[in-house]
Amino acid sequence: MTERYFVTGTDTEVGKTVASCALLQAAAQAGWQTAGYKPVASGSEMTPEGLRNSDALALQHNSTLALRYEAVNPYTFAEPTSPHIVSAALGQPIEAETLSAGLRMLEAQAEWVLVEGAGGWFTPLSETLTFADWATQEQLPVILVVGVKLGCINHAVLTAQAVQQAGLRLAGWVANDVVPPGQRHTEYLATLKRMLPAPFLGEIPWLENVAPESDIGHWLDLSALGSASSTGKAADRPAV
């Protein structure tokens, strides 16, 4: 059975993609065939191949499967704003059915699928749909990325409570040092470990420049997630 996880963050710009790449690397190092999925992305750039989003490209690069870009990122928008706003402006509605169809396709190929959301837990995708709604519909275990900075404790606890109130399992959380560690950094981490009702998967240190190929998976320990910690190398599979 395919392992599936949904990555959300305490806010936007907290390093969800960096953490997602690290998670994919760690799962690959454990021997799993992996696929990263960024179903909705904004702030994309036009290339000769069409609109491309840097976060989605990073997930594509760190997947062990050879994935087509469209399989990783079915909805991509140029304007760097909330998805529900830009999709409405362009007349391109984001449909839950399309998100789920893309997930089914990856599940059919990969053993370990990581879905990265956009923004925070309640990011709206339309007037009637949020990322939280879709993750709940899919019953995806959640991994929370905490951008360690002033205010993160409150944001992290509120997000964790919202995930649990949706009936989903908070599978683990990652501390991502989005600013150079301050004087009370150790106390922040200790408080988060005490207050968050989920396993601590590791801390990604302050990294000024992180490329998609950067080796960052070693910062995380997936053993608390369960079966993803064991080696399960699969046979070669075709590109999606």
Swiss-Prot record:
Active site (record annotation): 38
CDD domains in alphabetical order: DTBS
Statement: the UniProt record of this protein carries the keyword Cytoplasm: yes
Entry's localization field: Cytoplasm
Binding locations of Mg(2+): 17, 55, 116
Cofactor: Mg(2+)
Major site of localization recorded for this protein: cytoplasm
Disulfide bonds: none
Keywords, comma-separated and alphabetical: ATP-binding, Biotin biosynthesis, Cytoplasm, Ligase, Magnesium, Metal-binding, Nucleotide-binding
Cited InterPro entries: DTB_synth_BioD, P-loop_NTPase
GO annotation, cellular component aspect: cytosol
Single GO MF descriptor: magnesium ion binding
Transmembrane region(s): none
Enzyme class: ligase
Any one GO BP annotation for this protein: biotin biosynthetic process
Protein's pathway: Cofactor biosynthesis; biotin biosynthesis; biotin from 7,8-diaminononanoate: step 1/2
Entry EC no(s): 6.3.3.3
NCBIfam families recorded: bioD (TIGR00347)
Function, in words: Catalyzes a mechanistically unusual reaction, the ATP-dependent insertion of CO2 between the N7 and N8 nitrogen atoms of 7,8-diaminopelargonic acid (DAPA, also called 7,8-diammoniononanoate) to form a ureido ring.
Family, per entry: Belongs to the dethiobiotin synthetase family.
Subunit structure: Homodimer.
The protein, known as: ATP-dependent dethiobiotin synthetase BioD
Organism: Pseudescherichia vulneris
